[in-house]
């Protein structure tokens, strides 16, 4: 029997497990691997941010040549919370650049002391208070948050103008807002309690300890003395528990399976965007792409 479009249509769901300042973990369910992979790729390569793309040097007598410093400046993540307010340079009506498509940053540092002077991302001064180096918005005085650019000795100086533009990761990796964007299938773990009961206390402890991510738990001092699944989401499919069970002559002690329509995503942000915003932008981009395809199909172009 043929299936209708409504029967084939899925309604993907997203469940957030954890949100931090620089990362998010969520479950994408009721969909297939093609959608999961599309979401991952868009988060890496098609969510726009602001990054330094042009550097004009006025003075530089440091140990690093202009190209080295320009490359380092381009890799400094800039806060891009207002990215929607900027347009791409190629789409802007200006002849060269303007406030609608770019942001100017200045770096002017001279070492006047006998000890070396560290030039860092905190020395970059932006003409737009909303587009600044990510390290500059850290309120603590911890210098480890600052990104080093170059060291100057007495008498050396560096003076330049940098232009930040809007772009995406598929043009250059510096525009990617994601440090990490990975997913794995949600595991299905089933324990054979009859087989587990045949193990000695020592064997139970050895079997539970064979899992490097501590999926299982067992305490011989508890009244039940049962092996339990503590957190199935920790499973990385290393199969160490299967190997240990086989060494005990009980290969059917545990059953592992991947749930094909449920994916656990881990996304870490460079700081340019909040991790939850990366996910939302990616979903919007995918929806826009699908809408464009629908429009072209309706016009008979596909």
From Swiss-Prot:
Entry keywords, A to Z: DNA-directed RNA polymerase, Nucleus, Transcription
Gene Ontology cellular component terms for the protein in this record: RNA polymerase II, core complex
Gene Ontology terms, MF aspect: DNA-directed RNA polymerase activity; protein dimerization activity
Pfam family name, one: RNA_pol_L
Keyword Transcription: yes
Keyword Nucleus belongs to the record: yes
Subcellular location field: Nucleus
Top-level taxonomic group: Eukaryota
GO BP terms: transcription by RNA polymerase II
SMART domains membership: RPOLD
Record family assignment: Belongs to the archaeal Rpo3/eukaryotic RPB3 RNA polymerase subunit family.
Subunit structure: Component of the RNA polymerase II (Pol II) complex consisting of 12 subunits.
Entry function: DNA-dependent RNA polymerase catalyzes the transcription of DNA into RNA using the four ribonucleoside triphosphates as substrates. Component of RNA polymerase II which synthesizes mRNA precursors and many functional non-coding RNAs. Pol II is the central component of the basal RNA polymerase II transcription machinery. It is composed of mobile elements that move relative to each other. Rpb3 is part of the core element with the central large cleft and the clamp element that moves to open and close the cleft.
UniProt-recorded name of the protein: DNA-directed RNA polymerase II subunit rpb3
Annotated organism of origin: Dictyostelium discoideum (Social amoeba)
Protein encoded by which gene: polr2c
């Amino acid at each position: 029997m043929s299936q209708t479009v409504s029967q084939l249509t899925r309604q993907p769901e997203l469940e957030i497990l954890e949100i931090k300042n620089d990362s998010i973990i969520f479950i994408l369910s009721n969909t297939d691997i093609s959608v999961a992979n599309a979401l991952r790729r868009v988060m890496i390569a098609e969510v726009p941010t602001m990054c330094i793309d042009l550097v004009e040097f006025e003075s530089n007598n440091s140990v690093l040549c202009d190209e080295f410093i320009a490359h380092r400046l381009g890799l400094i993540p800039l806060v891009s919370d207002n990215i929607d307010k900027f347009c791409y340079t190629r789409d802007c009506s200006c002849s060269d650049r303007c406030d609608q498509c770019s942001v100017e940053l200045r770096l002017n540092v001279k070492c006047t002391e006998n000890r070396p002077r560290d030039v860092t991302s905190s020395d970059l001064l932006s003409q737009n208070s909303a587009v600044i180096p990510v390290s500059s918005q850290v309120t603590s005085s911890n210098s480890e948050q600052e990104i080093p650019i170059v060291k100057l000795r007495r008498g050396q100086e560096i003076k330049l103008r940098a232009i930040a533009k809007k772009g995406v990761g598929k043009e250059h990796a510096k525009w990617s807002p994601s440090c990490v964007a990975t997913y794995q299938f949600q595991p299905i773990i089933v324990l054979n309690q009859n087989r587990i009961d045949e193990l000695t206390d020592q064997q139970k402890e050895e079997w539970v300890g064979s899992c490097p991510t501590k999926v299982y738990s067992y305490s011989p001092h508890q009244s039940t003395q049962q092996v339990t699944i503590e957190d199935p989401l920790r499973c990385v499919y290393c199969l160490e528990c299967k190997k240990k069970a086989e060494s005990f002559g009980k290969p059917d002690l545990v059953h592992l399976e991947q749930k094909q329509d449920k994916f656990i995503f881990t996304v870490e942000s460079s700081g340019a965007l909040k991790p939850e915003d990366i996910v939302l932008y990616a979903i919007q981009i995918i929806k826009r792409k699908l809408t464009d395809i629908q429009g072209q199909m309706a016009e008979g172009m596909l």
